[in-house]
Amino acid sequence: MKKKALAFAAMACSVAMLLSACGGSNSNAASGDTAGSNIITAYNSEPQNPLIPGNTNETGGGKPVDLLFSRLVSFDKDGKASNEVAESITPNDDATQYTIKIKSGWKFTDGTPVTAESFTKAWSYVANAKNAQKCSSFFSAIAGYDDLQKDGLKGDEQLSGLKVVDDTTFTVDLNQSDSVFPIKVGYSAFAPLPESFYKDPKAFGEKPVSNGPYKLDHWDHNKEIALVKNPDYKGNEQPKNDGVTFKVYTDDSAAYRDIQAGNLDVMESVPAAFTKTFKTDKKVQAYSEAGSVIQTFTIPSSLDHFKNDEEGQLRRQAISMAINRDQLIDKVLNGNATAATEFTSPKTPGYSDSLKGADNLKFNASKAKELWAKADAISKYDGQLTFSYNADGGAKPLYDAIVNQLKNNLGIDAATNPIPTFQEFRDAVTNRQMKGAFRTGWQPDYPFAENYLWQLYSTAAADGNGSNDGDYKNPAFDDLCKQAAAASSTDDANKLYQQAEEILLNDLPAIPLYYSNASGVASLNVKSGYAFAWQNLPTYTEMSKK
């Protein structure tokens, strides 16, 4: 999420865009909704940025953005894509050009129509480096993207690969074949935007004009984001409730207690204090199934002694082998996760637990010490390695345990570095202020390996242009991902993505820890529709109190 940077609850918080703070009820988080209404109240963190689809890559903003904006395609509970705003998405023979026809009659909540230009201008705005949008790299496959990364732009230059044919038709020229493009456009960064956005993007982000199943009622910062049903919505996800109000919490245990008391309806995580008991708690409706979210930590590629060279690779491999993932899952997460074996997830087509280099993710303390000694022979390291995380998200038990394992199993000086809030934490990551390792994770934006790999570790997504927060760069990895995108079949693509992953398993730009279960709780007020979708998020539109 978004999507995005993930929210964490010591157990396995869902992330949709890279990390988002899982919290508990803040003293100013409002309690339940009006008695008898069918408004669903949902747990959330304060978004890092205004609610603009192309600048949202964490779950605090990603959850409301997903419900506010409809894209060309939507995904069902299992991740299957269906046309939504699109009437058709038709490739040419080699999938280097797509002709997209949109359905007539769609309109934004200000009454203006959704047209072909609503998409082409929005995509160009996100791609244009002048506008500094966090999801820019998602558009790197479209012709003209490189031209929009140059200095001296005004911000309104358009992608040359996008051509408007008429009000309901546009074409997309790509830099190379991409058979997965019709799935990618289901990500929120590909949402259309109304003309009012360009007049004042900042003001728009505070009260967006949208086209999705809900529209914004109000955003009371650090308290709640209230969405109400959009009566003009024409798409696939007709809400079975009257709205969703996202309550902002800074203490996830307090949020859980609000679920028990009926003052909050749903949260997509379980605090560490309740992971042993939530499945038998008669005051909540519990959910826990295998999920698609991966939890990791990242060591910046610019960090001395940890760069993408022989010394840095040895140290990263040593750190990874010194971590006993099964013990973390058993003792800290109470069994609500699965040890990571690669960089995607068991829910992703093409997943494998037997890739070359997978041994680097297995606990082996003696091998870890051997690799660390080899790195020291290249250049002695006597520093302290810090592990940063947002203190408002329940991550403390996990990172305390990781630091203790590294001290005991590898004999290095390691320490935690809690940062008070998720917003401060993400700002430090975004501004490249991290001087050590930091917590990361990924909730997929669409169900394909490319989303876990290219969007997180490609050169195109580095340097603030996407979600490559460690600024890892490897041309061989980039090339394999490009070959995979151009493959003629999904099977061929997955084989190439597996080869790309084997490079990551050697270089370890991030250290995979575990796959979070899709776990959460709902209040007893929720009468129907409570389940989790492929992104490890509740099925908000399906939930009802009636």
PLM feature segments, named:
Residues 43-93, 209:
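N-terminal lobe/hinge region of extracytoplasmic solute-binding protein
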Residues 115-122, 167-173, 212-213, 241-243, ...:
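Alpha-helical secondary-structure segments
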Residues 118, 127, 131-194:
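Surface-exposed binding/hinge segments that line
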Residues 173-239, 243:
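Gly/Pro-rich hinge or "lid" segments in bacterial periplasmic/extracellular proteins
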Residues 197-205, 232-277, 292:
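Ligand-site clamp/hinge motif
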Residues 329, 413-424, 454-523, 546:
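Extracytoplasmic/peripheral linker and loop segments enriched in polar/acidic and small residues
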Residues 338-375, 394-397:
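Structural transition elements
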Residues 520-546:
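Long beta-strand-rich cores associated with HINT superfamily self-processing modules
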